[in-house]
Amino acid sequence: MSLWGGRFQDGSSAMFRTVNDSLPFDRVLASQDIRGSIAWARAIAKAGVLNQDEHQQLEEALKALLVKADAGELDFDASSEEDIHSFVEATLIEQLGDVARKLHTGRSRNDQVATDFRLWTREHVDLLVEDVEAVIASLVGNADVNQDVILPGYTHLQRAQPVRYPHWCLAYVEMLKRDLSRLHDLKARLNQCPLGSGALAGTTYPIDRQAIAEELGFDSPCINSLDAVSDRDYVLELLFVASTSMMHLSRMAEDLIFYNSGEAGFIQLGDAVTSGSSLMPQKKNPDALELMRGKCGRVFGSLQALLVTMKGLPLAYNKDMQEDKEGLFDATNQWHICLRIACEVVDSIKLDSERCAKAAREGYANATELADYLVDKGIPFRTAHDISGRVVLDALEKKKAIEELTIAELKVYSDVIEEDVYPVLQLEYLVNKRDILGGTGIKPVLEALANAKASFKK
């Protein structure tokens, strides 16, 4: 059933239908489209467009259709309709005849699809919030059972300073908390109702738009009809949040891939989230993490595609905007998948605490501590930094750790160095001395972990 055929003498070509028809993907919006139509039927009944009997017939048919939609029982594949809107309307007309032909009075597909899409996006924001919180809970849980593990911290992928493993976990918790904040912020801007905006200029019928908005769970109606049907900022915002969060997951995946490598060997991943090689029997590959990292680019692409699509569009609706859906559907689906597999990966992690500690002691990670020791003895930091660097060079040439150098060897560089330097150079001292808010000392880490546990329990 065409919604716009009266002005045309010829039908659409098969190729045009291939380009134009959106039912193959916007069928995802079936439940939202039907809920919007239920609200619209009530609104036009109050406006006098439908009598009581007509409204009752429509509402009963729509509610029955909604049950089928929610159960996944609608037969889209047998339909030749253009989009989800014509599919629903054609189904109603088949059941009710001319009564169903009144449903679209005062409404355009422009405000209809904008409403459907906002409803769908709002629902998925709520699901994504749950998924992000689940990853946070997994990280917090893994940190909690590994409080005493110390491993190297890196800059430039070179060992820099030792950190507690929970401190590493909580770094990603902070990133994911920002993702949650962005999702909540987005929802506040998203939650306005376009229905009643018509094609672009509003409707001539006395529709109570505030009542429609409240019925559909929106905070308010959109206040400008042109903007209401043209706006896809909420799609772009969700794609941006998805891209940012996927970037966080990708960085975490990269860390864990390295930690899991034979070169580091800090962690082992469970069999359930790894795979083998068809040729090399010994391999246990971190494929879940690699796919998480790889899917990041796919989500980035959806954001870039819609930005480019929207940048040159005049007001109001243009068919280019039909390209908003597949990218968001795919990006949010990939994000859902990656968040859920991230939980499984984190839950599977087993740490080799001895190997972590050994690596943390290597690489002269205590060189900064030596410089700080010299500062405590009254030497200016820049001078102390230079002295510590020369001590590292000497230790490298002698193939020793700094703490393995004798007092005589150390005093070559500064007379203030005494036996009390050796405790300062020990791993636990290096970590616990950073006992400041946000640091990797035991006290701030345990406080941060306790706060996270209170907010994000499994």
From Swiss-Prot:
Its EC number is 4.3.2.1. One of its GO terms (biological process) is L-arginine biosynthetic process. Pathway: Amino-acid biosynthesis; L-arginine biosynthesis; L-arginine from L-ornithine and carbamoyl phosphate: step 3/3. One of its GO terms (molecular function) is argininosuccinate lyase activity. Keywords: Amino-acid biosynthesis, Arginine biosynthesis, Cytoplasm, Lyase. One of its GO terms (cellular component) is cytosol. Pfam families: ASL_C2 (PF14698), Lyase_1 (PF00206). It is an enzyme of class 4 (lyase). It comes from the Bacteria. Disulfide bonds: none annotated. The keyword Amino-acid biosynthesis applies. Signal peptide: none annotated. Belongs to the lyase 1 family. Argininosuccinate lyase subfamily. This is Argininosuccinate lyase.
